[in-house]
Design a protein with these regions (language model features):
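Acidic, polar ligand-binding/catalytic clefts
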Residues: 1-42, 124-127
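Solvent-exposed loop/turn segments at secondary-structure junctions
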Residues: 7-11, 34-37, 49, 53-58, ...
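Ligand-binding cleft/hinge of the Venus flytrap
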Residues: 56-79, 85, 107-112
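Periplasmic-binding protein-like
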Residues: 23-31, 110-149, 168-176
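Extended ligand-binding regions for polar small-molecule ligands
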Residues: 37, 45-47, 52-55, 129-171
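Short helices/loops that flank or line small-molecule/ion binding pockets
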Residues: 1, 15-17, 41-44, 76-105, ...
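A ligand-binding cleft/hinge motif common to bilobed small-molecule-binding domains
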Residues: 5-15, 59-63, 94-128
Length: 176
C-alpha cells in the first residue's frame, strides 16, 4: 500500500482502492521566523521552493492560485522537503510551499526557526486543502478493511491523537 503523504485525488480514486481519510492537510507557506514576510503579497518577486511533483506544486499550479504564482520571482523545484528546509536556512529561497503537517514537524523540532504565514486571525494561509488516505490495489479489499479497522481502534483509544500531538504539536487526525 501507499501511505506516506498520499493525498486523495480523483485520479488516485480511479487508480487505487483508497482508505478512509486519516488526516486533513493544508498546503501552506513556511518562512524563516525572522523574515519580514507576513502575507502572500509580501512574497511578490521572491523565490519560493516547492517539492517537485508534490501536492504543494499542484496547489501552486491551480487556477485559484494563479495570481499568487504569477507574482513570484521564481519557483524552485526541490527534490524533497528536507532539502527545501536547508535552502530556506541558507537563504537560497525565501519561502517554501509545503504540506502543513510536514511544516508542523519542522516547527515542533525547531520552533524558533520557522513560522507559517497566517491571516489576521492566526489561521494558516492555505493554498489548498486535502485529505491524506492510504492507497491499496483495487483487489486488496481485505487488507484495506483491516487497516481501516486498526485506524478506527487507534482513534477511539486515543493512540492517533497522542502520536499526532507528539509529531505535529496538535491533533491533525480525522478518523472517527
Amino acid at each position: 500500500c501507499l501511505w506516506n503523504g498520499f493525498s486523495k485525488t480523483p485520479e488516485r480514486d480511479e487508480q487505487f482502492n483508497l482508505s478512509i481519510p486519516y488526516m486533513k492537510n493544508e498546503q501552506i507557506i513556511l518562512v524563516k521566523t525572522d523574515s519580514d514576510y507576513q502575507t502572500l503579497e509580501d512574497l511578490a518577486g521572491k523565490t519560493i521552493g516547492v517539492q517537485a511533483d508534490s501536492s504543494a506544486e499542484s496547489a501552486l499550479e491551480a487556477e485559484e492560485n494563479k495570481e499568487f504564482k504569477d507574482s513570484l520571482g521564481e519557483i524552485v523545484k526541490i527534490e524533497d522537503y528536507a532539502m527545501a528546509v536547508l535552502e530556506i536556512q541558507n537563504g537560497t529561497i525565501d519561502a517554501i510551499s509545503i504540506d502543513e503537517v510536514v511544516a508542523r514537524f519542522y516547527l515542533n523540532n525547531d520552533p524558533d526557526a520557522y513560522r507559517i504565514l497566517s491571516d489576521s486571525d492566526g489561521n494558516a494561509l492555505s493554498l489548498a486543502t486535502e485529505d491524506y488516505v492510504i492507497g491499496f490495489r483495487k483487489s486488496d479489499n481485505a487488507l484495506k478493511e483491516k487497516v481501516e479497522e486498526a485506524l478506527r481502534e487507534m482513534s477511539s483509544d486515543g493512540t492517533m491523537k497522542t502520536i499526532s500531538e507528539e509529531w505535529f504539536g496538535e491533533d491533525v487526525t480525522t478518523v472517527e
